[in-house]
């Protein structure tokens, strides 16, 4: 992969009041600041993973140092912290800014389109007559099922990417997320320090976080419609994939740490994280007592904060149980 500026890196330039010269700086994710030359500044500013560095000999001499100073990625496999790794599928180049109007249009249409497709698909499934007759031994086409499921996970992240570009986020890449060697989903990486817009409204943040859920709802509707129109041999597979998309939408809507629902709710309330706010209010003895002194309102807030923590526990247990089942089935299949 061509060099890509890391998501936690920021670039800046300052005009020296004494000399009148412009000085260029780069700061990495661990807050180390380096002064760099103008040519390197411009090369890093344009390092989006889609082309070589705009330096002599494509910057081959300086790339090892830039990697060592935690300024660029050159491998598709990146360490995201702890046991988490990402595999970059799609570097999002800077040229997407040229068609930002298209992304704005798609983002504006997505909430309504997702609802209309889902209502249409659900109506057809509940009240329509299936086209054709199911075969006697109806079964799921495994390869198609997994292909559509992985596409649905990727589509969720493309929804975030679309909203991010529309609102002026510096979207870097779309990739697959791993814990160790186990794939657990997909992700979109953004460099908020280098975003083209500095202040985002609550409405923009909420839509950014909900756009992935909306994409899955729309996908579920499309699959339900397709199961009605296409060959009945495919119907069960398409319906099962629609169910997966509905499950993804519901799961991501929950207010658990790291999920879109928690981030959207936090943006709505104007705080960094409702999960950590719940922890602070319930685990801090003085805050907890202060809440309970406010009568019904205080008890309601305590119950709300408690439900956030319970949701977090249930989501973790659900994910772990699914991986236990997956490992068990894999071992059983092998042996």
Regions found by a protein language model. Name each.
Residues 200-334:
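Hydrophobic transmembrane alpha-helical segments that form the core helix bundle
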Residues 56-66, 84-97, 149-163, 182-192, ...:
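Hydrophobic alpha-helical transmembrane segments
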Residues 1-28:
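Long, low-complexity, charged/polar intrinsically disordered regions in eukaryotic proteins
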Residues 73-154:
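Topogenic membrane-insertion module of multi-pass membrane proteins
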Residues 43, 156, 175, 212, ...:
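Divalent metal-coordination and catalytic microenvironments
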Residues 79-83, 142-195, 267-269, 273:
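Small-residue-rich helix-interface/hinge motifs
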Residues 133-139, 192-200, 237-240, 294:
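Helix-boundary and loop/linker segments of multi-pass membrane transporters
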Residues 21, 29-103:
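Long, charge-rich, low-complexity alpha-helical segments
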């Amino acid at each position: 992969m061509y060099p890509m500026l890391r998501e936690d890196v920021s670039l800046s330039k300052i005009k020296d009041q004494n000399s009148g010269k412009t000085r260029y700086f780069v700061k990495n994710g661990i807050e180390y600041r380096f002064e760099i030359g103008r040519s390197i500044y411009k090369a890093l500013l344009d390092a989006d993973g889609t082309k070589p560095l705009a330096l002599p000999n494509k910057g081959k001499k300086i790339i090892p140092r830039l990697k060592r100073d935690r300024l660029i990625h050159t491998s598709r496999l990146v360490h995201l912290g702890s046991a988490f790794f990402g595999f970059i599928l799609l570097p999002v180049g800077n040229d997407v800014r040229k068609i930002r109007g298209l992304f704005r249009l798609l983002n504006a249409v997505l909430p309504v389109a997702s609802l209309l497709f889902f209502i249409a698909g659900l109506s057809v499934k509940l009240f329509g007559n299936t086209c054709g007759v199911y075969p006697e031994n109806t079964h799921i086409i495994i390869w198609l099922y997994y292909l559509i499921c992985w596409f649905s996970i990727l589509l969720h992240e493309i929804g975030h990417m679309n909203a991010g570009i529309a609102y002026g986020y510096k979207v870097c890449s779309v990739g697959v997320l791993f814990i160790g060697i186990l794939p657990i989903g997909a992700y979109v990486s953004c460099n908020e320090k280098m975003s083209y817009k500095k202040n985002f409204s609550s409405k923009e943040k909420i839509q950014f976080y909900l756009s992935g859920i909306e994409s899955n709802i729309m996908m579920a509707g499309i699959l339900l419609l397709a199961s009605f129109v296409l060959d009945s041999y495919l119907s069960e597979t398409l319906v099962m994939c629609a169910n997966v998309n509905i499950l993804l939408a519901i799961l991501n809507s929950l207010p658990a740490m790291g999920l879109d629902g928690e981030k959207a709710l936090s943006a709505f309330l104007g705080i960094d994280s409702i999960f950590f706010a719940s922890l602070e209010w319930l685990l801090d003895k003085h805050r907890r007592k202060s809440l309970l002194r406010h009568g019904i309102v205080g008890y309601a807030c305590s119950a709300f904060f408690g439900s956030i923590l319970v949701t977090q526990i249930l989501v973790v247990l659900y994910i772990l149980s699914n991986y236990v089942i997956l490992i068990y089935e894999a071992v059983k299949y092998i042996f």
